[in-house]
Amino acid sequence: MGALCTLWLGLVLLGVLGALQTSAQAQVSLQPNFQQDKFLGRWFTSGLASNSSWFREKKNVLSMCMSVVAPTADGGLNLTSTFLRKDQCETRTLLLRPAGTPGCYSYTSPHWGSTHDVWVVATNYEEYALLYTAGSKGLGQDFHMATLYSRTQTPKAEIKEKFSTFAKTQGFTEDAIVFLPQTDKCMEENK
């Protein structure tokens, strides 16, 4: 009887955890009819929101960076970002692997070794893209980030407002949302 109760309890817990996971993922929608070929090219990281302790510590010294999105042979994307770090330009490339539905990708964090999921939530391809990233940095350390990409270094006020609204719907507070200041440094590296 005890083993049966333990088995039942385990199944209930799995069901609850599965429902919680589905509920969290259901909050993030994808850009309808995502067209990867229109998403390619140069983007500027204009806004960020994150629950990461690293982000909270560094958000006041971050500046805008440039990223170039290029296709891979397997249908994924290379996301090459150039940013200012300790007065020098640094470039990093992430391989975003297709993860089912168009606009959904995954990558392995070079720092943590964990897998993160990335969703292209909304884009008009010509001005802005809203992305949401979720993953884990270890046991009990869930990582969430909202990103505003813009095709120019000066996104329109309504695009910034759209990003703020999106970030807040994902549970980020006002103080966790940052619009990155423009810089002339490291903006020509990936052209």
Curated annotation (Swiss-Prot):
Disulfide bonds join C89-C186. GO terms for biological process: mast cell degranulation; prostaglandin biosynthetic process; regulation of circadian sleep/wake cycle, sleep. Residues 1-24 form the signal peptide. Keywords: Cytoplasm, Disulfide bond, Endoplasmic reticulum, Fatty acid biosynthesis, Fatty acid metabolism, Glycoprotein, Golgi apparatus, Isomerase, Lipid biosynthesis, Lipid metabolism, Mast cell degranulation, Membrane, Nucleus, Prostaglandin biosynthesis, Prostaglandin metabolism, Pyrrolidone carboxylic acid, Secreted, Signal, Transport. One of its GO terms (cellular component) is nuclear membrane. Belongs to the calycin superfamily. Lipocalin family. Monomer. This is Prostaglandin-H2 D-isomerase. It comes from Canis lupus familiaris. The gene is PTGDS.
